[in-house]
Curated annotation (Swiss-Prot):
Gene Ontology cellular component terms for the protein in this record: cytosol
InterPro entries: DUF520 (IPR007551), UPF0234-like_C (IPR035571), UPF0234_N (IPR035570), YajQ-like_sf (IPR036183)
Keywords carried by this UniProt record: Nucleotide-binding
GO MF: nucleotide binding
Alphabetical list of Gene3D superfamilies matching this protein: 3.30.70.860, YajQ-like, domain 2
Family listed: Belongs to the YajQ family.
Protein name as it appears in the record: Nucleotide-binding protein CbuK_1936
Domain of life according to the entry: Bacteria
Species assigned in the record: Coxiella burnetii (strain CbuK_Q154) (Coxiella burnetii (strain Q154))
Biological role: Nucleotide-binding protein.
Length: 160
């Protein structure tokens, strides 16, 4: 039976490259000279440090531009609240990866509401969709691309 997987993965190497490029741009920009503004990439988060809230907003914009240039979907980013102290400001950007249970259930409900002859099952952080006809699977992919789920989705392991 034909099947495919729905997932939301993040290319860590590209994220690291985007953060390095953003650090280089902040180091060379005139409005950031001497401010000590930096990005720190650790695991599933990026920590932004600057002197003011305004600089943090500029740094987020720079990071989003670098993500876009590296073909990383900006929807992977979730901004935490900034921590602003006397002469420093800090903000954490969480990187979302994988499909959580609530999003997986929402995806399965969307598929079942279409009454197509396919089955969808949650497998860890992926959703596997199987069906008898390849056309049904392609219509599921089209449906999910149109819907607003809140996660960037990738479709892979398409097997006949």
């Amino acid at each position: 039976m034909p099947s495919f997987d729905i997932q939301s993965e993040l290319n860590k190497h590209e994220v690291s490259n985007a953060v390095d490029q953003a650090n280089r741009e902040v180091a060379t920009r005139f409005d950031f000279k001497g401010s000590g503004a930096t990005y720190k990439y650790e695991g599933n988060s990026i920590t932004l440090q600057a002197e003011t809230d305004f600089q943090l907003k500029q740094m987020i914009d720079i990071l989003q531009n670098k993500f876009a240039k590296r073909q990383i979907d900006v929807a992977h980013m979730r901004l935490e609240d900034p921590i602003i102290q006397h002469k420093s400001a800090q903000q954490t950007v969480m990187l979302l990866e994988g499909i959580d249970q609530t999003a997986a259930k929402k995806i399965i409900k969307l598929i079942k509401d279409q009454k197509l002859k396919v089955q969808a099952a949650i497998q860890g952080e992926k959703v596997r969709v199987t069906g008898k006809k390849r056309d049904d699977l392609q219509s599921v992919i089209g449906l999910l691309k149109e819907q607003e789920i809140g996660l960037p989705l990738q479709f892979d392991n398409f097997r006949d």
